[in-house]
Amino acid sequence: MLPRKREIVAGEVEDLQKKTRAGEGEVTREEGDAAMAGRGNEIDEDLHSRQLAVYGRETMKRLFGSNVLVSGLQGLGAEIAKNLVLAGVKSVTLHDDGNVELWDLSSNFFLSENDVGQNRAQACVQKLQELNNAVLVSALTGDLTKEHLSKFQAVVFTDISLDKAIEFDDYCHSQQPPIAFIKSEVRGLFGSVFCDFGPEFTVLDVDGEEPHTGIVASISNDNPALVSCVDDERLEFQDGDLVVFSEVHGMTELNDGKPRKVKNARPYSFFLEEDTSSFGAYVRGGIVTQVKPPKVIKFKPLKEAMSEPGEFLMSDFSKFERPPLLHLAFQALDKFRTELSRFPVAGSTDDVQRVIEYAISINDTLGDRKLEEIDKKLLHHFASGSRAVLNPMAAMFGGIVGQEVVKACSGKFHPLYQFFYFDSVESLPVDPLEPGDLKPKNSRYDAQISVFGSKLQNKLEEAKIFMVGSGALGCEFLKNLALMGISCSQNGNLTLTDDDVIEKSNLSRQFLFRDWNIGQPKSTVAATAAMVINPKLHVEALQNRASPETENVFNDAFWENLDAVVNALDNVTARMYIDSRCVYFQKPLLESGTLGAKCNTQMVIPHLTENYGASRDPPEKQAPMCTVHSFPHNIDHCLTWARSEFEGLLEKTPTEVNAFLSNPTTYISAARTAGDAQARDQLERVIECLDRDKCETFQDSITWARLKFEDYFSNRVKQLTFTFPEDSMTSSGAPFWSAPKRFPRPVEFSSSDQSQLSFILAAAILRAETFGIPIPEWAKTPNKLAAEAVDKVIVPDFQPKQGVKIVTHEKATSLSSASVDDAAVIEELIAKLEEVSKTLPSGFHMNPIQFEKDDDTNFHMDVIAGFANMRARNYSIPEVDKLKAKFIAGRIIPAIATSTAMATGLVCLELYKALAGGHKVEDYRNTFANLAIPLFSIAEPVPPKTIKHQELSWTVWDRWTVTGNITLRELLEWLKEKGLNAYSISCGTSLLYNSMFPRHKERLDRKVVDVAREVAKMEVPSYRRHLDVVVACEDDDDNDVDIPLVSVYFR
């Protein structure tokens, strides 16, 4: 990650790191403050854009001022620290009084065999610091005292006795202000979290969602008042929500800013707990907006919460009775460790029995809360594997706890209240494990072997995995797989592919990359970093996009050799393609995705679960073209329009110019052939660029930008309101300018308005770039010289035109109207274009500008934000800053490290099952989680849909095969034997046979493969022995029957 103010901070940080590595103990808060003084609270928006989209500036600033202690640097502590350093807190102090063991290499990716024997905390400092030089990372060794804790806003303990935890928590709880205390443990396949943020903790934003809004259509004078909204979009209000009103005409009493309560919320209306019978009558207009009040949470201290835990946060409702038992189990383990000063030995019957006895003993003291039954088998698994910190569990809980620290330091999102327990005991092999299988082998995988046994470990090491994508998810997966030993034997292989390169904005989450990797391929850099984590990892990094075009690379032999596929993708199209290949080759697919604090995982297991493509989210609703171009009513509409205009003016039109200049004859011929309104518009834009609007000096670019301002934000609005005055009525007699339409007003230009001047300068700079005109320094910031240059431009007076057609129909797909004279106009334009082109200097060309959102120095977002905000000003829509504009126009997907880490941890818990084999669908889990609320919803996957016909049944996972170089007739007869009447056979997008076409009957006695070669132009590669055809069938009652893909093995 790139540092902020590196020149100020780096030297002091390095000195402090030397101090901690020399074993001189902690860095004091004063030293840390001095070293970080140069950092300030400025935010590198290029670097943190995806995280800013989740947290916002205020939360980020609070994080920048937070000092955090992480105690216990086994895998869980390392994961928490990693997520906090990436998030950008002020400082992270690592504490551990133990030394690195080979055992730790199963879960802590900062450690290597060379670190064995060193203090764990000190061994992690340097590599953690590399992730973000703007965060001060230091180590504290030796005994921890309560006085140490006073230096922090939040403290996290991952390996501490219950007695000590209660002592520290009491201290933290009693401080003013309280210090947030978090205790979390990962013990084998079991984990726990406890949070105490003090007697009264204020949550500033409970869910992180944008406040819901609605456009008012009517309000009754009643008690309670009925508020109806336009049916453009469903309302998201819930009973009990508080809302405020603005812009209401008539019933102006509601515009007082007072929050009012919603009740009986419906999709397009709700009642307001307000007597409006004496208010003015509603006339028109109005925006209703949700108010999100702060929430105060009262936490119990740990000592009290242990005996009165209240409701546990649930995750898997098939394990409804599990949390109270695990609450007991962790206490029993603590007692075992306190009395014997060690963990139970894996597979030791005596040790397991002792933990069970402790659990029974503690249970007997619980009175009304005593459990009626204790699952001894579950406690056996818990105790036996309790010494192990497994990487997937550490990754999952590292995400959860990292997010809780962010909540504690910022007040953003609802804290976990107060206990959370989780287990993945289903990840254990189906066959019982013998004690001998669990014995350590003096290996870096010993912790994992102590839980799963050496047989499964061998399977993991020999696995052949295909991982698609090496971005945020991919980096986490690679780290996890390397620590788990996946593909780490001579027979194992991990193929990684990603066609993307590293950008600056990646560095805040994609922790395998550094600033010096910017511009390099993601896959090769990530693979190299993963091999540093585990040098035995057999990984092959490719830069091919997995798609139909690369099936020569990822061919049949490649797919058939795989054991599992892991998706680390960020788009649905690629996911659907990989899903189709996994179904075709019957390979397990482990799917996951994130959106801000939310994440989901889906297991796609051959013959057991439905595939990814079986259920899809509905497409995002698109605003009608007429709304975006003439009747916007929110900032999203303005930004959609702004980006469209940016691309039209600065990318598409210069590209059209170059297309004409590179081959005038072909270009003109294509325009004549098209002969439509679109071709006419393109020719007009090209001529404008080369004639009337051609720029030769920077002042010409200023003139162009100023006149565009007048055209867009004054003249067009004047024309629109001339065509549709404010009192216009529709053909049905309703007011034309009724909700959601907003009546616009022109913006009058003033060079003293900084936002207007900035927009014109940015637009002029980009216009100049398209013509290759040098940019003067004075033009890069609003100043007196710039204002004078803009004021020089002579702006003609506008005269509205009669008979102008403006698209108002919501289903219109084009703003260009066809005309019977298009062909004649095109001929005139072509003649004009040929004439203009003769005046151009030799070699003239334009430089199209492709929108790039992640470079704040290129003026792209200045233009788009300026476009959108001037448009918003026309329509009295609230304006946004450049950062918010970037999120919307740049279609930035909000992303943080914590949800990504959690998702990959959950997936890797499923990977144990997929590679072990033999598991039933009931053993697998899909997850949806929202760390903001927090919500964890874990459930069994849905089985695939079964289709039945006579005695046959099949699912999406089945493929029918026919052996032999058969004819079409023989294929029809083969299906007839199954009681199916085939009426259509296709290959790819081509129809090989249809019973309705007489000529197709001539093909019946030809080989299927020969017809495919002739009709579908299908060349079957030499490595493939079969051809796939899609057959449409009916049963004897003429009902369509969906049958599987049919593979004809002709070789």
From Swiss-Prot:
Pathway(s) this gene product operates in, as recorded in its UniProt entry: Protein modification; protein ubiquitination
Keyword Transferase: no
Gene Ontology CC entries for this record: cytoplasm; nucleus
Residues the entry annotates as binding ATP: A472, D498, R509, K522, D570, N571
Region (2 approximate repeats): 56-605
UniProt KW Ligase keyword: yes
GO biological process, one term: protein ubiquitination
E.C. designation(s): 6.2.1.45
GO molecular function, one term: ubiquitin activating enzyme activity
Reactions catalysed, as given in the entry: ATP + ubiquitin + [E1 ubiquitin-activating enzyme]-L-cysteine = AMP + diphosphate + S-ubiquitinyl-[E1 ubiquitin-activating enzyme]-L-cysteine
Active site (record annotation): C626 (glycyl thioester intermediate)
Keywords associated with the record: ATP-binding, Ligase, Nucleotide-binding, Repeat, Ubl conjugation pathway
A Pfam family hit: ThiF
Function as written in the Swiss-Prot or TrEMBL entry: Activates ubiquitin by first adenylating its C-terminal glycine residue with ATP, and thereafter linking this residue to the side chain of a cysteine residue in E1, yielding a ubiquitin-E1 thioester and free AMP.
The protein's name in its UniProt record: Ubiquitin-activating enzyme E1 1
